[in-house]
Amino acid sequence: MKEQEYFNVADIFGENVFNDSVMRERLPKKTYQKMKEVISQGRELDPETADVVAHEMKEWAIEKGATHYTHWFQPLTGVTAEKHDSFITAPMSNGKVLMSFSGKELIKGEPDASSFPSGGLRATFEARGYTAWDCTSPAFVRQDAAGATLCIPTAFCSYTGEALDQKTPLLRSMEAVSKQSVRLLRLFGNTTSQRVMPSVGAEQEYFIVDRAKYLQRKDLVYTGRTLFGAMPPKGQEMDDHYFGAIRERIAAYMRDVNIELWKLGVSSKTQHNEVAPAQHELAPIYAEANVAVDHNQLIMETLKKVAGRNGLQCLLHEKPFAGVNGSGKHNNWSLVTDDGINLLEPGKTPHDNIQFLLVLACILRAVDEHADLLRESAADVGNDHRLGANEAPPAIISVYLGEQLQDVLTQLIDTGAATHSISGAKLETGVKTLPDFMKDATDRNRTSQFAFTGNKFEFRMVGSQDSVGEPNIVLNTIVAEAFADVCDILEKAEDFDLAVHDLIKQLVTDHQRIVFNGNGYSDAWVEEAERRGLPNIKSMVEAIPALTTDKSIALFERFGVFTKAELESRAEVEYELYAKEINIEAKTMIDIAGKQIIPAVIKYATELGTSINTIKAACDANVSVQTELLVEVSDLLADTKVALAKLQEVVAEGLTMEENESRAKFYHDEVFKAMEELRAPVDTLEMLVDKEAWPMPSYGDLIFEV
């Protein structure tokens, strides 16, 4: 074991980030002040300032060892993209080169827009696209085996201005919710807050397996999840992995991840074992939404990159292993002013906090009226495997408020006024040496998709490998709409106090159906939700149409977040993505079954038959056990061959379909079903065939031997 290196986190935190302290130190005072205004007040960046910033950024990056820069952006592929350009200029007459980086190169790039998903917005011959510097998310230097690269967070749009990424609409939605939040604050006499920013913290779950074993599983390599696999004798039923002692190999990996992230200014805070064997979680401290989205991408990239260095493999798929919990990403969301006021802070007496109650009522309205959009924002091929099982919230959107706030709302609905708030009692353990302390006013509900957790909402439906961009785009926009509508009413009110009380009561009464504080895993809740008229959208394919309803188009166009064309293009991209992912999984199953499993089982059955004949020839022994096993294996082998032929047939049919939506529905209804039918006999065979004869590592090998 290598000797442990000790250090002070404060000494390395943000050392590879061109942050405010670096700008204050390196930029001329006038330039620094202009940049502060651009970042904090949303002012335009003039070319002269951009040139000065670019020069200092380049000099700083070169000191860090950087030879190249890249516009780091997030297209609709779900992962980041980048093109690297070196700082060198054309050689001079003496053969030497200079290192140069201009303001124009800083603020604008030109990747090929036709090579990324666009849903028809860009044809192959319409290649021009632009990346634009998001100066509110700091540039950073990424150091790895390939060297050091200056990474500039950017937005990505087409030549005609349509958004082709996650960041552009996210920034638009942030402006929308800020503007409407400030309107609401002004109604309550706040004249100091100038901006309100969504604050986001994304908890990241993941699996870690041994890389050598991972490389022996084509399904993991090609799709990120196991397409075959029988459960080992032990799974997660003992509840001994969650918060258990972290194994030394994993702890060393986590340490390396933290060091990388801290240097990049990502405030990695919490790490622990999750419920399933080999499953873990990393959680950062909150940041402004666009920075938090960038940081989550950095977290996922770093988890994968550092795993490889440690002989490990990080699995970010929502359901890499059947039979144990999958992975999600809890999106913690609140609204905070530029002078530090959290709009979701209820205070000690929330019944008296009228501003908070109005904000809460607006959020209930937003979630109730746009539950389909919120569900769509978490729609993902992998997420279809975990939503609705006893490991993740069901696909029905509801809001958990807890005992304290539910009691306040009940008072408002029943009497028109709330006069008291339930307080947290003292927790007494009965052990004198343990301190007594005040409990929170409400418990936590881990089965809720959208839960109030003290001073924020936690959206727990997001998939582990997805960007948190889309969920926050939707949250920001639907809340902006609710704020705008109540401001339209209250700004015209003759008696504000009376009007705001009446409006809060009306909103919580009209939208109380969205509140559910019980067990979201129960069948009874599914039935109750249906009685309440709440949508139960069970799959990604069923969720996508929410993007292009008249209501959704009107919502996003009203606040300038998406155009109709942009929404239609995203729906097309998602249909296409769904069909492609299932197609890759199906072809991988065909490949594994045909080239590995069937040959291995035939060989095993042949050896079994030879063994039976050898024993019979040697003596009159009882070979009924071997014979029964051979018959069972042979029957399952025949079932496997039939199921394989069926899967090949439906995949071929799916490939003939040209229209994205119909193809996606076919893959959901027919291809996925055929995949399940192939898996069933294969998983049974794995439990019968000699382990030495089975052609790939088992679940037990993967999740317990790391």
Show the residue positions of the predicted features.
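Active-site proximal loops enriched in glycine and acidic residues that flank catalytic Cys/His/Asp
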Residues: 49, 73, 102, 284, ...
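Short linear, low-complexity motifs centered on an aromatic residue
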Residues: 78-94, 111-114, 119, 217, ...
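C-terminal amphipathic alpha-helical interaction region
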Residues: 504-706
